[in-house]
A protein has these predicted regions:
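Conserved S-adenosyl-L-methionine
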Residues: 322
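Short, surface-exposed charged micro-motifs
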Residues: 251-253
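Glycine-centered tight beta-turn/hairpin loop motif at sheet-sheet or coil-to-beta transitions
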Residues: 247-249
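Alpha-helical transmembrane segments of multi-pass membrane proteins
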Residues: 1-245, 256-272, 280-283, 290, ...
Length: 322
C-alpha cells in the first residue's frame, strides 16, 4: 500500500519538524499555564494536578479526533489550518486570559461554597487551555498518516515522529522555565511559541500556494495580539505597585506606602513579608516572631546571633536589629 504526498510534504523532514514544534509548544503552554494561574490560584500541587490533568484530557481527545479525521479526510491543509487556529488561540491568552480567570473567579465565588480553588482553577484551565491543546493533539495521528508511505518501514517512521515530539517536549520544558519566562515574562513566552506554530503553518501554505486569505488574516490577528498582549501585569486593577515581575521561581509583587513595604510571591492576595518603616507591628501573625529577641537576657540587639532558615527578603533580620 503506497500513498504519495504533495509539495513540501514529500520531504519527511518538514513533517518531523511539525511534530517537533508541536511537542515543544504543548509543554511551553503547560508551563505558561502554571505561571498564568499562579498569581490567582497559587502554584500548589492541587493547581499543578489540574493543569496536567486537563491538558492530558485535551491531548487524548485530540489524538482520537485527529486519527479519525486523518482517515476520513487526509488533507494536510486541514491539519495546518488547525495549527493556525491553535497558534492564534495561544497568542490570545496573554490578551484575555487574566480577564477570563478573574471573571470565572468572580462568578464562582458567589455561587460555590466549597472547594472554590479547585473548581475555579479547573474551569479556568478548561476554558483557556483545552481547545488549543486539543487541536495540537490532532497533530501526531495526522502526521503518521502523511509520513507512512508503505508498511515496510512504518515502525521506523512512527518511532522517528515520536522521538521528534519527545525532543521538542524536552526543549519546551527547559526553555520557558530557564530562558523566556525569566527574561521576557509569561505573556511574551506565549507569543513566542504561538509565533513558532504560526510560522510553521505559513511556510506550509506558502509552499503549497494555498490559503492566502487564511495566512493574511492569521498574521493580522497575531500582530494584534503582539501589540496588546505583551504586558506581564497580572494585577491589572493596581496602579501603584512599586514592582511587578517574574523570577525563575515566582511571580513577584512589591507594594509600598508611607507605613510599610509588602512583598507577595505567586499570589495576588497574600503577603509573603512586610517591612514596617516606623517600627510598628503589622497586626498579622508575623508579629509573633518579633518576640524572639526579647527572650535573650541582657544582650543588645546589635550583638545578637540569630539563625534564620530561609532568609527570604531579609525583613525579619532587619526587624530583629531594631
Amino acid at each position: 500500500m503506497e500513498r504519495k504526498n504533495r509539495g513540501i510534504l514529500k520531504n519527511k523532514l518538514f513533517l518531523y519538524l511539525t511534530e517537533f514544534f508541536s511537542g515543544m509548544s504543548v509543554m511551553a503552554v503547560e508551563l505558561g499555564a502554571s505561571r498564568l494561574l499562579a498569581p490567582y490560584f497559587s502554584s500548589s500541587q492541587i493547581v499543578w494536578t489540574i493543569i496536567i490533568g486537563t491538558i492530558m484530557i485535551a491531548m487524548a481527545l485530540g489524538n482520537i479526533y485527529g486519527g479519525r479525521t486523518a482517515d476520513k479526510s487526509p488533507n494536510p491543509d486541514k491539519l495546518y489550518g488547525r495549527i493556525i487556529v491553535a497558534a492564534l488561540w495561544i497568542a490570545l491568552i496573554p490578551v484575555v486570559g487574566k480577564y477570563i480567570i478573574v471573571g470565572i473567579s468572580a462568578v464562582l465565588i458567589f455561587s460555590v461554597n466549597n472547594n472554590f480553588l479547585i473548581l475555579a482553577a479547573f474551569v479556568a484551565c478548561m476554558v483557556i487551555f483545552v481547545f488549543p491543546l486539543f487541536l495540537l493533539g490532532t497533530v501526531t495521528p495526522s502526521l503518521v498518516k502523511y509520513s507512512v508511505s508503505n508498511l515496510d518501514d512504518n515502525g521506523k517512521t512512527v518511532g522517528t515522529l515520536g522521538a521528534f515530539n519527545t525532543i521538542g517536549s524536552i526543549i519546551g520544558t527547559f526553555v520557558p522555565t530557564f530562558v523566556t519566562i525569566p527574561a521576557v515574562g509569561t505573556s511574551i513566552t506565549f507569543l513566542i511559541f504561538a509565533g513558532i506554530l504560526l510560522a510553521l503553518s505559513i511556510v506550509y501554505f506558502v509552499m503549497e500556494k494555498a490559503g492566502k486569505k487564511k495566512v493574511i488574516a492569521s498574521v493580522l490577528i497575531f500582530a494584534f495580539c503582539c501589540g496588546t498582549g505583551y504586558s506581564d501585569s497580572f494585577a491589572f486593577w493596581e496602579n501603584n505597585l512599586t514592582y511587578e515581575g517574574e523570577s525563575v521561581y515566582n511571580y513577584l509583587q512589591v507594594y509600598e506606602n508611607d507605613e510599610r513595604v509588602a512583598l507577595s510571591t505567586n499570589v495576588l492576595f497574600g503577603v509573603q513579608s512586610v517591612y514596617m518603616k516606623q517600627d510598628e507591628l503589622t497586626g498579622m501573625y508575623y508579629d509573633y516572631a518579633m518576640a524572639a529577641p526579647l527572650m535573650l537576657k541582657d544582650k543588645p540587639t546589635d550583638q545578637m546571633d540569630v539563625l534564620i532558615l530561609g532568609m527570604g527578603t531579609g525583613t525579619y533580620a532587619t526587624q530583629c536589629r531594631k
